UniProtKB/Swiss-Prot annotation:
Location in the cell: Cytoplasm
Organism of this sequence: Methanosarcina barkeri (strain Fusaro / DSM 804)
Keywords: Aminoacyl-tRNA synthetase, ATP-binding, Cytoplasm, Ligase, Nucleotide-binding, Protein biosynthesis
NCBIfam families: leuS_arch, PRK12300.1
Main location: cytoplasm
InterPro entries: aa-tRNA-synth_I_CS, aa-tRNA-synth_Ia, Leu-tRNA-lgase_arc, Leu-tRNA-synth_Ia_arc/euk, M/V/L/I-tRNA-synth_anticd-bd, Rossmann-like_a/b/a_fold, tRNAsynth_Ia_anticodon-bd, Val/Leu/Ile-tRNA-synth_edit
Annotated protein name in UniProt: Leucine--tRNA ligase
Length: 966
């Protein structure tokens, strides 16, 4: 082995060996298979730390399964469809300054190459090469024969087949539907197309039509039931409103809304015509009619009304909305004569419409007063609003004032009221984003009611029922995400599946439309199996007919009929079908949590729609995001840490280990320079340890006579083997690295500190295999230096051997380590130079007391009095009658509080503490730097300060002779 760890040299060496040996190219055989996939990357930038985390998790799982004896397929492709790459090409062609800066400075594209990437095709080719290179350089065990891009002509044939079959099942429909829309591109946008607001959802509001003469002042609300409690409207005096003629289904009305709302209305299925501007003052102080109750309500000024939200006019329900109550109260003593308002607003009566167990008649007023909220600007007002809303939604029922709706649950009334209000022309539906959305082209997006649009009919209850069934049979990692998946399935509505611009596959039954980017990335895992035959030239595009896909993916028809249609031999068709049946279904789909509400859901929907139940996915795993020094990363805006730059600077194995050890699976990780530097030092130490063990030439097997410290390290390793395997099964990579590296490293240090050396080679043999999924290049290098001919990537992963567990040895070493730490702490605190240390082992009666306490704890009968009574009934313990009550009063609270772990281990093997400490005297004297004497607390020969009485089982009392340091 080299003197120093040189990651880049080692990594290039082993990547070359892996490629040459083709050990990651998977073919069907007699072994149990494991098919793992992760979302292929979108090629509008270089791979970043977020990809690094998700992809490395996948690789670690793949490598672990491979070492456990599974036949593992871990493939990769590239996603390029949609509009982002087209938009990026336009920005580069136009030399957009921000784009040129971000892609040269942060993505690392050379300045002479970047300007040439001015077409989508050039961008795809460039990032495809760079992404594959980055994944090879970090050491992913991918079968690269199966790679493809989503604009490959053969892939388009696969997508056409999928959509023809979905259409035949009635799962693709045409109609009007609200979609996220870019007015500039004149296209629907999906998450990949969005610059800001990627997590925004389309929210359905009910517009309530308050009337003033021949005008309608509509108000958007998420809670149409509160219309029964409206006392006034809020109008912003600083906003310009417009009068518009609005026509829907032949019904013509004149509406007053903000200019921003007018723009949004033009994208709905209404016909909207601008008439004139309306000064805000002209609609403040007017008396309007509540269309639901026919009550008269007044409009009042409110600067908090935002013109871009809803219609720019807000209805006020002060009995149930804390902000409305506060805003109304704030106006009680304000002179509003400039708006023609002279009446006393205190006379406005609150209207109660919801009965809530936790509140009286006016929940908003009650919570404002109980929380001491003084104004609308008080931060507690937001908290109060959430509390009232939550309690009313989950436990509220409507009162008599709501007429026929009395007694209905608030949680179930929205759709009923919206339907009834629409039918009576007192309300309409209006769609709004949950937060602002900006397209990657820079244009603010709108909710557009698109006519003649194609949709995937995800709201279909029969389709959803199959997805629920699939989910119920699946393993979800972590399990707590199951509820989120269930909720997302429940809420999922029809989704636009086509666009008119961008890269992608044309809808086979309507060539004017292109299938959108999330719609063509749902069952591509099955294409990996076909891609291997395309790559070797056995399949051509003309062979990929509908009957080809029907036969090899669905098993429909027979090979003879498919052969006649495709021009392929029956034998080849049967071979491809055999490959599909071997590899499918997907055993694990692992992804970032941002894909839960979209891609991962669609992945399930399309699988259950097209495949038989035995081909449905088996498991889903979800991981968190990665930030950079506390900042959220962005491919288009920065900051960003690319996979290539991390590996180039720190090496593949250090990058892999660090990204997986910073946070547990669903937690968000934060990449920090200080952290990666620490990981580098840890890996250096591991390399140095391995080099030292190998060069020592000492090899011992388990038949050698073993000392206690040897039995201890054997036992500890088994614990780490068990816990690492368990953590990897649960995809808890941080926990796995803690056990397989950091905790084991600490124990190896203790083993060597205690003079252990017999089993260092055995330790290294297991340690290298434990770490191989995480740091594969380094482990291959060490494995080879140990004399192994076959790669560690294919070696047997360590398996737990219960026969090597030695509780006695572990307990003994824990006592020695704890005793040493206690002595060192006393010396540190007292600032003493020790001359002699006296250790006092616990009297036997204390051990008996603790054993009795453990038994009574298990029987749920542990109480101070009960334990004293039981101990005093023992004739051998009666003579300790004065000391027993004090000790019992000390230990029982520890048992009760759950802090009795150190006592409970006493129920295990018997330890002769005095003999153990006497055997360890030479070690303790070397560590402490002075002589050590061991006494029994039952009869200490020397105890000038009566320390022996403090001795407890496994925790000797300590007295130090010495002098203060000058």
């Amino acid at each position: 082995m080299e003197q120093d760890y040189k990651p880049h040299e080692i990594e290039k060496k082993w990547q070359k060996k892996w490629d040459e040996s083709q050990i990651f190219q998977a073919e069907p055989d007699k072994r149990e298979k494991f098919f793992i996939t992760i979302p292929y990357p979108y090629l509008n930038g270089n791979l970043h730390a977020g990809h690094t985390r998700t992809f490395t998790i996948g690789d670690v799982v793949a490598r672990h399964k491979r070492m456990l004896g599974y036949n593992v397929l871990y493939p990769m492709g590239f996603h390029v469809t949609g509009t982002p790459i087209v938009g990026l090409a336009e920005l580069i062609a136009n030399r957009d300054p921000q784009t040129m800066d971000v892609y040269e400075r942060l993505h690392g594209i050379p300045g002479d190459i970047l300007p040439t990437l001015d077409t989508p095709e050039k961008i795809v080719d460039y990032f495809k090469r760079e992404s594959e290179k980055a994944m090879r350089n970090i050491g992913y065990s991918i079968d690269w024969r199966r790679k493809f891009t989503t604009t490959d002509p053969t892939y388009k044939k696969f997508i056409e087949w999928q959509y023809i079959r979905l259409g035949e099942k009635g799962l693709i429909v045409k109609g009007s539907h609200p979609v996220k829309w870019c007015p500039n591109d004149n296209n629907p946008v999906e998450d990949h197309d969005i610059l800001y607001g990627e997590e925004a959802t389309i929210v359905e509001y009910t517009l309530i039509k308050f009337r003033y003469k021949d005008l309608v002042l509509p108000c958007a609300t998420l809670r149409p039931e509160t219309t029964y409690g409206v006392t006034n409207l809020w109008v912003n005096p600083d906003v310009t409103y417009v009068k518009a003629k609005v026509t829907l289904d032949g019904n013509e009305e004149f509406w007053v809304v903000s200019k921003e709302a007018f723009r949004k209305l033009t994208f709905t299925d209404r016909t909207v015509e601008y008439i004139e501007d309306v000064p805000a003052k002209s609609i403040i102080g007017i008396k309007l009619t509540n269309p639901v109750t026919d009550d008269e309500v007044i409009s009042l000024p409110a600067s908090f009304v935002r013109p871009e939200n809803g219609s720019g006019i807000v209805m006020s329900v002060p009995a149930h909305a804390p902000f409305d109550y506060l805003a109304l109260r704030d106006l009680y003593d304000v002179d509003l004569s400039e708006y023609g308002i002279t009446e006393d607003l205190r006379k406005i009566k609150l209207i109660s419409l919801i009965k809530v167990p936790e509140f009286g008649e006016f929940p908003a007023k009650e919570i404002v007063e109980s929380m001491g909220i003084t104004s609308q600007k008080d931060p507690k007002a937001e908290e109060a609003t959430k509390i009232v809303y939550r309690r009313e939604f989950h436990g509220g029922v409507l009162k008599e004032i709501t007429g026929k709706y009395e007694g209905q649950a608030v949680s179930k009334i929205k759709d009923i009221l919206t339907r009834d209000f629409i039918s009576s022309n007192t309300g309409e539906t209006f769609y709004e984003f949950s937060e602002p959305v900006v397209c990657r082209c820079g244009t603010p997006c709108v909710v557009n009611m698109v006519k003649g649009q194609w949709f995937l009919n995800y709201s279909n209850p029969e389709w959803k029922a199959k997805v629920y069934k699939c989910l119920a049979q699946m393993r979800i990692v972590p399990e707590e995400y199951r509820v989120e998946f269930e909720n997302k399935i429940d809420w999922l509505k029809d989704k636009a599946c086509a666009r008119r611009k961008g890269l992608g596959t044309h809808l086979p039954f309507d060539k004017e439309w292109l299938i959108e980017s999330l719609g063509d990335s749902t069952i591509y895992m099955s294409y990996y199996i076909i891609a291997r035959f395309i790559e070797n030239g056995e399949l051509k595009i003309e062979n990929l007919t509908l009957s080809f896909f029907d036969y090899v993916l669905l098993g429909k028809g027979d090979s003879a009929a498919a052969s006649a249609d495709t021009g392929l031999s029956p034998e080849l068709l049967e071979e491809i079908r055999r490959h599909f049946n071997y590899w499918y279904p997907v055993d694990l789909r692992s992804s970032g949590k941002d894909l839960v509400p979209n891609h991962l859901l669609f992945f399930l929907f399309h699988h259950v729609a097209l495949f038989e139940e035995d081909k449905w996915p088996k498991a889903l795993a979800v991981n968190g995001f990665v930030s950079l020094e506390g900042q959220k990363m962005s491919k288009s805006k920065g900051p960003i840490l690319t996979m290539e730059s991390a590996v180039s600077k720190y090496g593949a194995d250090i990058t892999r280990m660090y990204i997986l050890s910073t946070a547990e699976q669903t937690q968000d990780a934060d990449w920090q320079r200080t952290g990666i530097e620490s990981a580098r030092r840890q890996v250096d130490r591991f390399y140095s340890f391995a080099k030292g063990v190998i060069e020592s030439g000492k090899r011992a097997d388990l038949s050698t006579e073993l000392k206690q410290i040897d039995r201890w390290i054997l036992s500890r390793i088994q614990n780490y083997i068990r816990d690492t395997n368990s953590a990897l099964y649960s995809i808890q990579t941080r926990e796995a690295i803690q056990n397989s590296f950091f905790l084991l490293q600490n124990d190896v240090k203790w083993y060597q500190r205690r003079g252990g050396e017999t089993l260092l080679y055995y330790v290294l043999d297991n340690w290298v295999r434990l770490m191989a999924p995480f740091t594969p290049h380094l482990c291959e290098e060490i494995w080879e230096a140990m004399g192994h001919k076959d790669p560690v990537s294919l070696a047997q992963y360590p398996l737990y051997n219960e026969g090597l567990i030695d509780d006695g040895a572990e307990l003994a070493e824990e006592m020695i380590k704890g005793t040493l730490e206690d002595v060192e702490e006393i010396i540190r605190v007292t600032k003493m130079t020790p001359q002699k240390v006296h250790l006092y082992t616990a009297p036997t009666w204390k051990a008996e007391a603790i054993r009795c306490a453990c038994e009574m704890q298990l029987e749920c009968s542990l109480e101070v009095g009960n334990l004293i009574k039981k101990l005093m009934a023992n004739p051998d313990l009666k003579r300790f009658g004065k000391e027993i009550p004090k000790f019992v009063q000390k230990i029982v609270p520890e048992f009760k509080s759950g802090s009795s772990d150190r006592y409970e281990i006493l129920t295990g093997p018997d330890i002769d503490e005095q003999a153990l400490l006497k055997e360890s005297i030479s070690f303790l004297e070397k560590e402490i730097g002075c002589s050590v004497e061991v006494h029994s607390a039952d009869s200490p020969a020397f105890d000038p300060e009566k320390k022996a009485r403090f001795a407890e089982p496994l925790r000797p009392a300590i007295y130090i002779e010495g002098k203060k340091k000058e």
